[in-house]
């Protein structure tokens, strides 16, 4: 069984102490939701050993000097899962408007979840 690599919170806290206010970006910090991986695999994909950073760690990091958390793989997984599912269930569809709509909706759902429950960004736009 694969174990996700832990974030180095000791290093994050050391940077915070030595460089107060210095913005930190976490690259490659997708959580790789297993429901999306399973959907992709169920509908013909072949993703092995997919693993990401646990959301609890991302939530904790968002409370530190981390100002940006990159989650592009989560976006791609959400889109790919929805497209694979749609095309498997509707094999005659060839118009991108038909299969991109559920893909956009799935990405939207993922981003709302991340903003509200993981990244600590909910309600911050009003502060800008």
Regions found by a protein language model. Give the residues of each.
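Metal-centered catalytic cores of metalloenzymes
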Residues: 1-128
